[in-house]
Amino acid sequence: MVAVCVLSLSLAGLSVSAEPVKVGNPGFPYSVPGSFLTVSRQVKGQYGFKTHSGLWIRNVSTAWREDVCRLVPSVGGRDVEVTECVMRDGWIEAVTEKGPIEFAFARPDLLLVRSKSPEMHIRFEFQRPRQKYDFPSAFGRRIDYLHYNADRLLMDTRVGARDPDKGNTVRVHPSAGGIEVAILDIHTGDWDGAEPTGSFEDAVRTQKASFERMLASLPSVPKAFERARHEAAVLFWTTIAGPRGMFRRPMMLMSNNWMNKTWSWDHAINSLSLGYHDQDVAWEQFRCMFDFMSPEGMMPDMVSDEEIYWWAVKPPVHGWVFSKLRRMKEFPRERLEIAYDLIGRWTNWWLTRRDFDRNGLVEYLDGCDSGWDNSTAICMNRPPLETPDLQAFLILQMECLADLAKTLGRGEESAQWTARSQKMLDALVRVLFDANGAPRVRRLRDNGFDSASLSLVTRLPIILGKRLPEKCRARMIADIKEKGFITDWGLATESVNSRHYKTDGYWQGPIWGPATLIAVEGLRACGEDALADEIALKFCKLVTKSGFSENFDAKGGGALRDPAYTWTASAFLVLAHELN
């Protein structure tokens, strides 16, 4: 009861903003589910943007990985600045002093661009050719066929008129009704000669309904965080790429900026926030990276629509995530069978391919394997390393498999997974906690230990809760409380008291959503609900201040790195919902 009172008082100072979501502005591109095209206002030098400032259409396929064209409005021969973009119901406006330019997707591959002003002209400045065979071509009065090495775009000037082909710039002039242009993204095959169809009004209705479904599918949150929930829905809605190239199903990218890929633990975290009300979408996101699993059971580090990266892996959080998804709503038997097979193969890969000294504990070969790329616990010790977080995830994963096997009527297999989980738990406590209960990292190269690390990653075994001996739990809880991990904004990934702490140090200090989520889950499993609520609430307040950035300054709360990152939003939604 006391914790509830503290929480309600802590929320009292927060208010819900009525401002429109700033999608389409620097760092937060606008798109719709299934599309690879985005629209955003860019500022040169901001968020790594290198070309001219202005309003840009981009393609997030890694085959492009760059801007497609800049839209420059002009009135009376003078260029007009786009000052901001505003999301409406199913479309966005690029605001200028002479009236807006409007964008709506008739379908994922068809973007409509409209100005109702009879005075506004628009130049479509396509990027300079990368190769001599990258060029725009013109067909008659309306059609421009823009052939690039990576893709093809068809530009249909529906309302207004365009100049004849002049290099890489297409100039569209208004009629009495203004301008309307349809841009068709042609990824495979060739143009069939048919003009793209679909009205702007129909596009708005379709996308409005699509967004409302996304918003309704997300979990409830305290009223003070409702605007952040809405922004999370916009972020999710704009970052789901359709089946194309390597992608066999819709896949939520981490970002429509430069982190335009999916990683092999990010996807699992994202599935959690979707699982409360839309199990089908959650299942697609949970399963998507398993599409690329090797015959041996290895999952790649990351995947784009054009490439698979095998040089690293990511931590096996999938059993923990799937167990949590099952608690939200049980899956049909067919999906349980699939999950049992996939998670089982992934687990066996770790047990057979990453236990180099055959001592029952598995190893990371690289910081990226841990997901904490440059964590001091990893990079200061030099892999291969046995770390307590890795064993904790596998223990929970084997428990998940034991429970799945039991549900599926495979009693003998269930008992085997239970025994393997217990065996690893015993080894974890014996080897990777010292006599005082402190977590430590073991180096295979010299059989040495590091128990002095001030990286939060070594405290993540707290997710095992009361499976661990009391002294181990007590030590990690005390470390979190007393060793400089908790700041005004949440949990630092490296203690602020550490000599290795860096404000913008990636995993050497900044606050990350998934790390916060795992730690909070662990504190709850240990009965530390008040502390869990405190940390969760701080993180939720942080994203209302600084958005859904990749990570955050642990001391100042400022946004760092990629400014619109989906798993940050997912961590927020789960944390906020469980506060609710």
Predicted features by range, described:
Residues 203-206, 210, 224-231, 278-290, ...:
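Extended, well-ordered alpha-helical scaffold segments
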Residues 261-292, 456-469, 516-529, 536:
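Alpha-helical support elements that line or immediately flank enzyme active sites
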Residues 221-260, 285-308, 356-386, 426-511, ...:
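Extended glycan-interaction surfaces of carbohydrate-active proteins
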Residues 265-291, 313-357, 382-400, 572:
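Substrate-binding cleft of carbohydrate-active enzyme catalytic domains
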Residues 7, 13-224, 561, 566:
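Terminal accessory carbohydrate-recognition/targeting modules of carbohydrate-active enzymes
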Residues 1-5:
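Bacterial N-terminal signal peptides that target proteins for export
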Residues 173-196, 296, 301-317, 331-333, ...:
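The feature captures the catalytic groove of carbohydrate-active enzymes
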Residues 272-275, 320-327, 396-407, 463-466, ...:
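Short glycine/serine- and small hydrophobic-enriched flexible loop segments
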